[in-house]
Regions:
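GST-like domain detector, emphasizing the conserved glutathione-binding G-site
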Residues: 1-25, 30-106
Length: 106
């Protein structure tokens, strides 16, 4: 079952699950975490500073340890790794912000 719901509990797009790789002390990660809180979505943090398995998964998938990176798993099973805090915030806002969606439709 999807862990990706927006405000009001509606399931979003074709995304099955999201996970943010980073750590709370990182200012760029903080930017993404703040957006997640404002959008009221459930995105687990995979703390790369305290869990070497998360850090290894990030390095294996992206070839780098730079954070934040959003792991996006689609329903059909494909996985995308999205780096850069502003790109992540834009991705999340485009999919989960009701006001942004209403402006695009109207």
């Amino acid at each position: 079952m999807s862990n990706v719901t927006g405000a009001g509990g509606k399931w979003v797009d074709d995304v099955e699950s999201l996970a943010l790789y980073g750590y709370p002390e990182c200012p760029y990660c903080r930017r993404v975490l703040n957006a997640i809180a404002v959008l009221e979505i459930d995105v687990p943090l995979r703390n790369t500073m305290i869990d070497s398995d998360h850090n290894a998964a990030l390095l294996a998938a992206t070839g780098r340890e730079t954070v934040p990176v959003l792991r996006i798993e689609k329903q059909e099973g494909s996985i995308r790794w999205l780096p850069e805090s502003l790109d992540i915030v834009r991705f999340l806002t485009d999919r989960f912000d009701r006001e942004t969606k209403a402006m695009k439709q109207g």
